[in-house]
């Protein structure tokens, strides 16, 4: 009496391995799309938070009649006096200092060196803010009258989000 062998043939095993390979390839592509979308959403959220924070803090100065203090850092230290609100780049500097703990969702550190902070002080030109190594950074600058916020979604000026609000 001959025993019947049990098991899978080589062809069956190869088919299973091929199916697993196809599923893995599709899953990696889909996962990559989800993570890039999440990073872009986080950068947009940082952008909106900067605008809301700066506007809310500047309104405090308006409520107090232009006196007192606004924009305190998380450690409670004063970053901007209401009397300096109209001074060139003072609102931007205070905003960057107050939101110092925001991290870059892309994890990109500038090619020139530096850190992984998401909110940075801009140079004063919306057209030149995004360059190599700036993906995920939100740049804040003001000219004394207008606060400009620009977020870079790639290392080029084409894929950005820009906003501005009046400095009051």
Identify the role of each PLM range.
Residues 3-35:
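N-terminal single-pass transmembrane signal-anchor helix
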Residues 18-20, 29, 53, 94, ...:
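Compositionally biased, intrinsically disordered low-complexity segments
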Residues 56-168:
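Periplasmic/extracellular, small/polar-rich flexible segments of pilin-like filament-forming proteins
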Residues 6, 29-32, 51, 104, ...:
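Intrinsically disordered, low-complexity segments enriched in small/polar residues
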Residues 2, 35-36, 40, 48, ...:
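General helical secondary-structure elements
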Residues 39-65:
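Membrane-proximal N-terminal amphipathic helix
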Residues 1-3, 56:
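Short, contiguous, well-ordered secondary-structure segments
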């Amino acid at each position: 009496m001959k025993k019947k062998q049990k098991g899978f043939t080589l062809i069956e095993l190869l088919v299973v391995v091929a199916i697993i390979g196809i599923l893995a390839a599709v899953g990696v592509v889909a996962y990559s799309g989800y993570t890039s979308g999440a990073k872009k959403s986080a950068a947009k959220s940082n952008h909106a938070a900067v605008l809301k924070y700066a506007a809310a803090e500047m309104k405090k100065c308006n409520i107090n009649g232009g006196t007192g203090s606004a924009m305190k850092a998380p450690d409670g230290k004063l970053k901007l006096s209401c009397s300096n609100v109209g001074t060139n780049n003072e609102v931007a500097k205070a905003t960057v200092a107050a939101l110092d703990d925001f991290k870059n969702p892309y994890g990109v550190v500038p090619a020139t060196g530096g850190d992984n902070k998401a909110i940075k002080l801009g140079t004063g030109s919306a057209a030149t803010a995004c360059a190599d190594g700036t993906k995920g950074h939100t740049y804040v600058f003001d000219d004394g009258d207008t606060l400009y916020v620009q977020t870079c979604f790639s290392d080029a000026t084409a894929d950005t989000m820009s906003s501005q609000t009046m400095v009051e």
